[in-house]
Amino acid sequence: LHKAIRRQRQMCIRDRATMVAFGTASSSATLPLTIACCEKRGISHKIASFVLPLGATLNFDGSALLQTVAVIFLTQAYQVPLDPFLIIQIALLAIVASSTCAGIPGGGLITIALILNGMGLSPEQLVAGFAFLFTIERITDMLRTTLNVTSDTVVAATIADNENEINYDLLNNPQAYEEIA
């Protein structure tokens, strides 16, 4: 398992699907290429075609991370007192809200507004904070999508390894990486 995850981490760095995810900022648009890259690297079609679409639909860990950080940043900027319980509540709300995001560019921005709405900010502060987040949205969206696609491939490799549905000859073949990238 450790060997599969270590090799998967290396292959995600120079993966065409990761580059397309970064450029398009869309998990859904990257999905066919992600499946193809995983299959060329030795993950069985059965695992890749089940796990990756499920991950592209539900696994938005990059969005959950950004939503948590953005809400905490804006509440601190407007001097809203945060106790540990509220920070945990923000993180849990972000995890739940991120699973409702669409896998399209800008899909996570709306959920940030929903979480901010419950933090006791005035309407003017909400608009100003949302405007600030909107200015950096494209850059953060590209990074979030790259993280989402990378974590989907790691989960697929882990499940394939547990189910003995991974071809280590393809996984350890450096020429397969050059053909894809």
Region locations from a protein language model:
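Single conserved hydrophobic/aromatic residue that forms the stacking wall/gate
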Residues: 1-13
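Short, structured coil/loop segments at alpha-helix boundaries
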Residues: 3, 32, 45, 122-129
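Hydrophobic alpha-helical segments, especially transmembrane helices
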Residues: 4, 17, 60, 138-139, ...
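Small-residue-rich segments of transmembrane alpha-helices in multi-pass membrane proteins
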Residues: 16-24, 113-120
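Helix-loop-helix junctions within the multi-pass membrane cores of secondary transporters/permeases
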Residues: 17, 21-98, 156, 173
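Transmembrane alpha-helical segments and their short flanking loops
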Residues: 68-181
